[in-house]
């Protein structure tokens, strides 16, 4: 059962919190969700185009959105703050990102504020690990080597366990298959176990590959 549902939704309210912190009337709730998706997509596209890769844990860990009547506060949790700020000076990158999101957003009543926070333990973030694997696969690095290195990163972060899965036409083979590796414990059916999860899609010259990562952080 543990692998058939999203591990984050399965533990929501127990060990996982919400990344969208706001409320709305039932009639306008769907519009609020679409708004969040637009903001996240705009941020991810901008970062992907402009980010400078200077280490193995560059990228977005997750995005948190808080809404008030007159303000939308967006907090971007990144592996390294400098990866976005180095584009064109210390603050130019954030200002340009804010302008781009504001254009997409089209709201006169709410102002937008974007902050960037550096995560304390980047090697324990499944999104950052998945982005690392995606970059390696695009460079035609062996998938086994990329998975092995990812597990080494997770061990540096003192995680209790990690499972990495890659599916699709791996290494350009005609028949799609699933390859996975696990190190340590990953108790997917234990609700009190804090497990971070990521599902990531990467386009390679051979086609689309799916990357899934489960990280067992702690037992509450």
From Swiss-Prot:
GO terms for molecular function: rRNA binding; structural constituent of ribosome. The keyword Ribonucleoprotein applies. SUPFAM superfamilies: Prokaryotic type KH domain (KH-domain type II), Ribosomal protein S3 C-terminal domain. InterPro entries: KH_dom-like_a/b, KH_dom_type_2, KH_sf_prok-type, Ribosomal_S3_C_sf, Ribosomal_uS3_bac-typ, Ribosomal_uS3_C, Ribosomal_uS3_CS. Keywords: Chloroplast, Plastid, Ribonucleoprotein, Ribosomal protein, RNA-binding, rRNA-binding. GO terms for biological process: translation. It comes from the Eukaryota. Residues 43-120 form the KH type-2 domain. One of its GO terms (cellular component) is chloroplast. Its main location: plastid. It is found in: Plastid, Chloroplast. Belongs to the universal ribosomal protein uS3 family. Part of the 30S ribosomal subunit. HAMAP family: Ribosomal_uS3_B (MF_01309_B). This is Small ribosomal subunit protein uS3c. It comes from Chloranthus spicatus (Chulantree). The lineage of its organism: Eukaryota, Viridiplantae, Streptophyta, Embryophyta, Tracheophyta. The gene is rps3.
């Amino acid at each position: 059962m543990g692998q058939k549902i999203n591990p984050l939704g399965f533990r929501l309210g127990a060990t996982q919190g919400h990344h969208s912190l706001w409320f709305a009337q039932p009639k306008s709730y769907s519009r609020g969700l679409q708004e969040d998706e637009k903001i996240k997509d705009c941020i991810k596209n901008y970062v992907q185009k402009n980010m400078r890769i200077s280490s193995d844990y560059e990228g977005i860990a997750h995005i948190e959105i808080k809404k008030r009547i007159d303000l939308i506060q967006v907090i971007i949790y990144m592996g390294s703050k400098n990866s976005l700020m180095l584009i064109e000076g210390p603050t130019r990158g954030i200002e340009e990102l804010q302008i781009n999101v504001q254009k997409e957003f089209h709201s006169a009543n709410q102002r937008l504020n974007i902050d960037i926070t550096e995560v304390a333990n980047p090697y324990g973030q499944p999104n950052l690990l998945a982005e690392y694997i995606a970059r390696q696969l695009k460079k035609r690095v062996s998938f086994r080597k990329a998975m092995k290195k990812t597990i080494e990163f997770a061990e540096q972060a003192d995680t209790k366990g990690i499972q990495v899965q890659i599916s699709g036409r791996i290494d350009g083979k005609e028949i799609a298959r699933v390859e996975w590796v696990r190190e340590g414990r990953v108790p997917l059916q234990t609700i009190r176990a804090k497990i971070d999860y990521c599902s990531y899609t990467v386009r390679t010259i051979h086609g689309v590959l799916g990357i899934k990562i489960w990280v067992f952080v702690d037992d509450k």
